Amino acid sequence: MTPEPTEPQIKVYRYRWVIIAVFAVINIVVQLQWLSFAPIAKAAQSVYGVSALQIDFFSIIYLAVFVIFCIPASYVIDTFGIRIGIGIGAVLAGIFGLMKGLFAADYIMVCIAQTGLALSQPFIINSTTKVAVRWFPITERATAGGIGLLSQFLGMIVAMIVTPYLISVDARGVYSISQMLMTYGIITAVGAVILLVFLRERPPTPPCIEGQDERFKVFEGLRHMLKNRDMILLIMVFFLGLGMFNAITTCIDQICKIRGLNFEQTGLVGGMMLISGVLGSIVFPLISDRLRKRKAVFLFTGICSIPGLIGLAMAGHYWGMLISSFAMGFFFLGGAPILFQFGAEINAPAPESTSQGLLMLAGQIGGILFVIGMNGLGMIPSMVVFIFFSLINAILFFLMRESKMIQPDLTSTMDGQAQ
């Protein structure tokens, strides 16, 4: 007699929270390095004797290197796994973070170190959805993605708020940034070691039913994604939305300088956007997972972010900038992890790291173009253009279709038994 087939027992493991925690640590330090000059651009200009655009170049390097290495990094992650993929990023971050601190006084050497740090970024960022799929059930994946994105915000928050307090100025008005860069270098190296010690490739048993984690190869997945109508719309959304965010955070010192804000106030304006983004990235993914809806939630956050952007463009005083920054960050950044998870779901069985990498690629290209445009057109006129772009994004959100994977009938069998 042939035994009757039985349903496989699905288990999720508590160690998944260790995985997402160490992944968060490496995200924090890499994003900290990205924006280390953003709130102190004027001081950095004085130290290196260069133009504002040359200081913005430290951020542009991150965006440009991501554009070049996005797909190769996704290939490594999908071919060799998250331990090797993220591990490569961690090693690069640790080495070049220390180099940036050791050669802090030399503009060229700092540019080289920043390039190495930028190379680490796609190996780490492109792994977010892969980590979520490898370790978490479908009903926790937007939450896991939200934690990954939250950690990126935390790194940016530290860069924005703490950096102005780590630079020094002597009686002659000469700035020093060496202590700040060395401190960040040591923190980055420690974060890399923590990641390498605790990261594991996969749990003993998968967190989903058989077949739910089957994936195309990278280039087959790319072809699949580029034939997907909703993915094309999502790429356009990230080109405009993430591009605007990258440009605003890069040029935050120039934006605030027009309003007469000092370094500390500039850092708080930028930090407020990111702090509220952390709150939003906790609240909205939980709502999305609980309601089992993606489109309705990110459409809501996209529309609600527009008044905050209008305030950043029009506010004439410090408190207006703070309030507007909070409003924009809470809704604009709060919807981001849902969009990443939505992209992974509508493109299944394409690799998650490839879908996330393609979306990030669009946003980085947009960021490069928008930073250059802001330095040419001017800060306030560019912010007005961004308001128009946000309205376009709201229309694109409306045109998208809901993810089928998140529907209740498909997720009811996928909840695991915690072990």
Model regions: which residues?
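Extracytoplasmic gate region of multi-pass secondary transporters
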Residues: 37-38, 228-281
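Conserved MFS/SLC helix-loop-helix module at the cytosolic interface between two early adjacent transmembrane helices
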Residues: 68-107
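Helix-to-loop junctions at the C-terminal end of transmembrane segments
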Residues: 69-81, 280-293
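Cytoplasmic helix-loop-helix junction between adjacent transmembrane helices
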Residues: 113-151
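Juxtamembrane intracellular "pre-TM" segments in multi-pass secondary transporters
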Residues: 5-13, 202-234, 415-419
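C-terminal transmembrane helical hairpin of 12-TM major facilitator-type secondary transporters
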Residues: 292-339
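Cytoplasmic membrane-interface "Motif A"-like loop-to-helix N-cap segments
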Residues: 79-90, 289-302
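A late C-terminal transmembrane helix in Major Facilitator Superfamily
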Residues: 344-378
